[in-house]
């Protein structure tokens, strides 16, 4: 490990956030003598951010905790274009109303991790639509576009991958990297920003911003990326059988979020405690050292602490209690995720495949059939043996619900409405 002078870089390194930096020595010197103002951008492509965004959010959290100033940049402008990074097809163009609605929906996530206000190191939230929508096209070409080499842009991974696969790359997407670079320059001018952080897939775009700042005469700018989120087995994190692990409780119940962290691989527990909780490093070391069945206790701590950061301590403890009631006592907890089903639908017989899909426990009827063959789906703790099974009021428990389960840890209660 490198011995940095600044608390900021030492903290990020100790907890495993650092992947690449444009100039470690220069950034460390700056952070050790002055306040760093850093930003991370978030496009508004969905009503919620997901677990994949957490690394960069936690980087901003530790930036602020070490006395520096974070900027959460909403991509109200860039979302109108669409980031081609990591995409093998053109993003769907969203309406302006949908982008605005998504932006409002994700704003609250940052309030859980950052302190906003007018203080010296209080966080700022801004939207690149403020300047991107006011740009004059001809002036943009003359003042900004002339600094970009098509030759270099064609070597960017996001562009090269699409071209090599002979997949269409629209002109509007090709311009995304120019807009992101300009964001950096604009934030440097408006807020004295001197660092952009993001995932390693954004490295090329961020470095382009550093270079554009130099060419346009801003102060020295820096780039810092975190690794992409993967499990110890190399699988990309952030997805379950039911879809993305959303951060908004309206899109993923708190209990499911808790269970996501409870179910991580044993080898990932120590690393994820460093990245996704604010527990002291000494306590993390003790938890990471647990072996055998004891590692499950560390997983419960990870799940509760990660959930508490996002949804609050009370909700995290409630999720932990629900898991304890469900698994250790074998009871049906009222805190399990619920799905209302019309009484008329149940009375006429509801197909089990469609109900498991509707409950979010599987992604499709085909997956439900595969799970049934493997004994993975249960109704009221009894394995489903027939994919043509229908549920009726006869399946209601004394509590007036039907318990759907996939595996041992994922449950949804059907409640007649």
From Swiss-Prot:
It catalyses: tRNA(Tyr) + L-tyrosine + ATP = L-tyrosyl-tRNA(Tyr) + AMP + diphosphate + H(+). GO terms for cellular component: cytosol. GO terms for biological process: tyrosyl-tRNA aminoacylation. Disulfide bonds: none annotated. Signal peptide: none annotated. A motif ('KMSKS' region) lies at residues 236-240. It is found in: Cytoplasm. It comes from the Bacteria. PROSITE patterns: S4. InterPro entries: aa-tRNA-synth_Ic, Rossmann-like_a/b/a_fold, S4_RNA-bd_sf, SYY-like_C, Tyr-tRNA-ligase, Tyr-tRNA-ligase_bac-type, Tyr-tRNA-ligase_bac_1. Gene3D superfamilies: HUPs, RNA-binding S4 domain, Tyrosyl-Transfer RNA Synthetase. Keywords: Aminoacyl-tRNA synthetase, ATP-binding, Cytoplasm, Ligase, Nucleotide-binding, Protein biosynthesis, RNA-binding. Residues 350-417 form the S4 RNA-binding domain. A motif ('HIGH' region) lies at residues 44-53. One of its GO terms (molecular function) is ATP binding. It is an enzyme of class 6 (ligase). Its EC number is 6.1.1.1. L-tyrosine binds at residues 39, 176, 180. ATP binds at residue 239. Belongs to the class-I aminoacyl-tRNA synthetase family. TyrS type 1 subfamily. Homodimer. Catalyzes the attachment of tyrosine to tRNA(Tyr) in a two-step reaction: tyrosine is first activated by ATP to form Tyr-AMP and then transferred to the acceptor end of tRNA(Tyr). This is Tyrosine--tRNA ligase. The lineage of its organism: Bacteria, Pseudomonadati, Pseudomonadota, Alphaproteobacteria, Hyphomicrobiales. The gene is tyrS.
């Amino acid at each position: 490990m490198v011995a940095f002078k600044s608390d900021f870089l030492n903290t990020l390194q100790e907890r495993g956030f650092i992947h690449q930096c444009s100039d470690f020595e220069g950034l460390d010197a700056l952070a050790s003598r002055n306040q760093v103002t850093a930003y991370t951008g978030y496009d508004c492509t969905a009503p919620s951010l997901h677990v994949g965004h957490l690394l960069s959010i936690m980087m901003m959290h530790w930036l602020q905790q070490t006395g520096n100033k974070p900027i959460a940049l909403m991509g109200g402008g860039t979302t109108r274009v669409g980031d081609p990074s990591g995409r093998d097809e053109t993003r769907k163009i969203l309406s302006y109303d949908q982008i605005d609605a998504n932006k409002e929906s994700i704003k609250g996530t940052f309030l859980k991790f950052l302190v906003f206000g007018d203080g010296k190191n209080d966080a700022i939230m801004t939207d690149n639509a403020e300047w991107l929508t006011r740009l004059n096209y001809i002036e943009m070409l003359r003042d900004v576009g002339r600094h970009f080499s098509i030759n270099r842009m064609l070597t960017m991974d996001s562009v090269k991958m699409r071209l090599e696969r002979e997949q269409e790359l629209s002109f509007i997407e090709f311009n995304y990297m120019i807009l992101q670079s300009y964001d950096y320059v604009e934030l440097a001018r408006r807020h004295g920003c001197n660092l952009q952080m993001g995932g390693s897939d954004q490295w090329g775009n961020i470095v382009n911003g550093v270079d554009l700042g130099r060419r346009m005469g801003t102060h020295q700018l820096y780039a810092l990326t975190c690794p992409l989120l993967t499990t110890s087995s190399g699988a990309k994190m952030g997805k379950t059988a039911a879809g993305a692990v959303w951060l908004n409780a309206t899109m993923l119940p708190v209990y499911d979020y808790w269970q996501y962290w409870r179910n991580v691989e044993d080898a990932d527990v120590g690393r994820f405690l460093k990245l996704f909780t604010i527990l002291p490093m000494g306590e993390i070391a003790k938890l990471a050292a647990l072996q055998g069945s004891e590692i499950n206790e560390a997983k419960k701590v990870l799940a509760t602490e990660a959930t508490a950061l996002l949804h609050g301590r009370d909700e995290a403890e409630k999720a932990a209690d629900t898991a304890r009631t469900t698994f250790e006592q074998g009871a049906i907890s009222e805190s399990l995720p619920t799905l209302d089903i019309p009484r008329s639908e149940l009375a006429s017989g509801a197909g089990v495949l469609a109900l498991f899909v509707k409950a979010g426990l599987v992604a499709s009827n085909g997956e439900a059939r595969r799970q049934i063959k493997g004994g993975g789906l249960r109704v009221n703790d009894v394995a489903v043996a027939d994919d043509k099974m229908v549920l009726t009021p006869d399946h209601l428990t004394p509590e007036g619900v039907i318990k759907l389960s996939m595996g041992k840890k994922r449950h949804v209660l059907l409640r007649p409405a």
